Amino acid sequence: DSEWISTLLRAGLLNGSFIPEKRIREFRDLNRYRKSVIRDITSQKNRIEKFLQSSGFRLSSFISDIFGASGRNIILHLIEHGQIDKTALDSCLKTKTRNRIDEILMSVNGTLSEHQKAFLRILMTHYDSLKKHLAEIETSLEKDMAPFALQVEQLNSIYGISTTASCAIIAEIGIDMKPVKTAAHICSWAG
């Protein structure tokens, strides 16, 4: 095989691989890691929601985002007190969700033991650390993307392409398309 490949190479029948410049490859690593951390956050949110439901707290039945302001206030109250009454629930809810306080109260009728409160605290601490880690990654990404502001702006002008998508595109294929023969080649390479 190696003899055949060397023969093809000497005959000029092999094309070089497309490899973006170093700073693009480094940016790609960070961007892919960002996606991994987002998956970790989603898994942790699902773990917390499952734990709450198994403990008798069906927050997602009445609160669309249990990690939003109202949901988070309820979770923090449960960590401290293990249960919640109507007065405490009213102080945890924001204006929009207060209209459904009686329905929400029925969905949070469980009680957490000391072990469950400690476990929920651990779960939330891990969730918060993942969110903080994601913010650090995004700060690094913004700094790394600064030299590509013009390209990001150009990509954003395409309908449906957000800044996040623009960054992902640049991270995967770079900005120099000279080594690429056709659009089909870059599509094939990028997947």
Enumerate the language-model features and the residues they cover.
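A detector of single, family-specific signature residues
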Residues: D1-G191
